[in-house]
Every structure is written in C-alpha cells, then in structure tokens.
Amino acid sequence: MEAYELDKIKVLATSFRGAIEIAKDAGEFDNDFAFPRFPKGCCGDTSDLLAEYLAQHDIYTYYVCGQKGTQSHAWLVLVNTVTVTTDNSDADRKYKSLISVYSEDNDVMLLRKYYNLKDAIIIDITGDQFTNQKCFLYYNIPVYVGFLDDFHKLFRVDQCSIHEPARLWDARCKSLYRAITKYIK
C-alpha cells in the first residue's frame, strides 16, 4: 500500500469523524438511541457508515468486531490487506458428513473462512471511547489508520465480513448517513 493511499484514507476518515462531531453538536442525533453519546457505544454503526462512505470513494473494507471480556469493539480493515483462507480440517469434514446424514440435500458445502489480520490496515474512528479505561490502555486516538497496534490486539475477533451497502440501510442508518455527510467539508 502506497503512502499516498493511506494519506487519502486518513483524510477521508478524519473528515467523516469530524462531520459526526459537527452533526452531534448541531443536535442531529438528539432523537437517536446511541449517537448522542458518540463515540461511546457507536463503533458498530459508525464502522458501517464509514464503510459506506469509503466505498463511495472506491475504498473497500471488512467490518471487524472483537471482544475483550464483556466489551466489544468494531472497526474496519482494508479488503486488499487481509488474507482469507478456508478450513478443510478433519473437524469440518466430520461436521459436513454429519450434516449430510440429516440433510435432504447431501451436497452440503461447509467452509469456514479465516481472516488473517496480521498485515491488515485498520481504520478505526471510535477507539477513543476507551480513553479513561486502563484495561484498554487509555486508548485516546480518535482516528487511527495503520497496522495492528497493541490496542486492537486486545480484542478476540469474533466477526469479519465484507461491507455490503444494502445490508445496513434501514431508515435509521439512512437518516444518520444523511445527517453526517451533509457536514463533510
């Protein structure tokens, strides 16, 4: 990945984060259940909204969700920096065999995808919600674009999926997206 590409992503992510803060201050989120407390508790929705904004600029991402204890956190990673493999282990073959016994369709396809994030470029605009928490390293970076750092290593990744624009566009998300993007400079 070229430095100028990372710079472009950082500029876009910073603009999007800034627009969220302006929209919040303007009262755009007063009737929403989560965004009045941005960035606290908004990482999942924010990641989806940012993924859509980046896709509008031909930057494609995976949505990543991780867990540390009872706390979850979501962020994005660039698609072209993630290695995806499938598992064909004995356990998967046995599970597939068991499913085929109970399935009318004996042609069962079971592939678990594994996402190697070791060299992934992370885009996270809500990490600073953990600023006051020692167990999260007092993480205070509002916009992070870079490789896996100590903070993101804290989370056991539970989910990694490609951003699908149509999957999040309920009325609430459409409203949030419009409210945010009208403040992008």
Question: What residue ranges belong to the model's regions?
Answer:
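A structural boundary/capping signal
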Residues: 1-185
